[in-house]
């Protein structure tokens, strides 16, 4: 936002989506839940690269308006005149997941320290937004590898789930 407002070109060095560019799953973001972690009306698992997301932000009217969020609200006039330069990747194919790129993993947050956490995030990250659930065992030691709740007995839950004979 600050770059666009001050006529400074934004340069994005595109990088692979760790889950690949073909995996798309989940409903698109409901506009009522826009926040600094979810602005785009794309599925929860979207398959887009950071460059594609940046282009979407630049080209989609209204997408950079998030009431109450700081640092990302940009007027339509500023968005339209902002300069964006995306440097494309070489050698990446949409079918490639992170391990196939041969690139070194650099943690994207304190909780996403490795590719295992990337795989688990879509499955467990949303569940932890539902109240007292945790996405680590214990705390941040193994984030996004499962969920826990202080009032749920894991053995009893496992027994009840097995009794349902669910496929998979």
Please identify what each model-predicted range represents:
Residues 18, 23, 35, 39-47, ...:
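Residue-level preference for alpha-helix termini and adjacent loops
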Residues 11-33:
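Glycine-rich, charge-decorated loop segments at or immediately adjacent to ligand/cofactor-binding or catalytic sites
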Residues 13-16, 89-90, 147-149:
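Active-site-proximal beta-strand/loop segments in catalytic clefts of secreted hydrolases
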Residues 1:
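Cleft-lining beta-strand/loop regions that shape enzyme active-site pockets
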Residues 5-9:
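A short helix->loop->beta-strand "cap" motif at the edges of active sites that frequently abuts
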Residues 92-94, 98-168:
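Glycine-rich, aromatic-lined ligand/substrate-binding cores of catalytic
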Residues 34-121:
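Conserved anion/nucleotide-ligand pocket segment
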């Amino acid at each position: 936002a600050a770059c666009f407002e001050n006529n400074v070109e934004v340069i994005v060095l595109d990088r692979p989506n760790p889950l690949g560019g073909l995996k798309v799953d989940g409903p698109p973001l409901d506009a009522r839940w826009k926040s600094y972690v979810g602005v785009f009306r794309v599925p929860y698992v979207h398959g887009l690269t950071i460059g594609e997301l940046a282009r979407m932000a630049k080209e989609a009217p209204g997408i950079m308006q998030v009431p109450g969020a700081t640092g990302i609200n940009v007027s339509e006039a500023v968005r339209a005149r902002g300069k964006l330069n995306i440097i494309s990747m070489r050698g990446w194919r949409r079918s490639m997941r992170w391990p196939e790129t041969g690139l070194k993993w650099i943690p994207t947050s304190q909780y996403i320290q490795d590719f295992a956490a990337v795989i688990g995030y879509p499955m467990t990250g949303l569940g932890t937004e539902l109240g007292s659930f945790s996405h680590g065992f214990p705390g941040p030691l193994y984030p996004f590898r499962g969920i826990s709740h202080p009032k749920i007995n894991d053995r009893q839950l496992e027994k009840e789930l097995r009794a349902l004979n669910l496929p998979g």
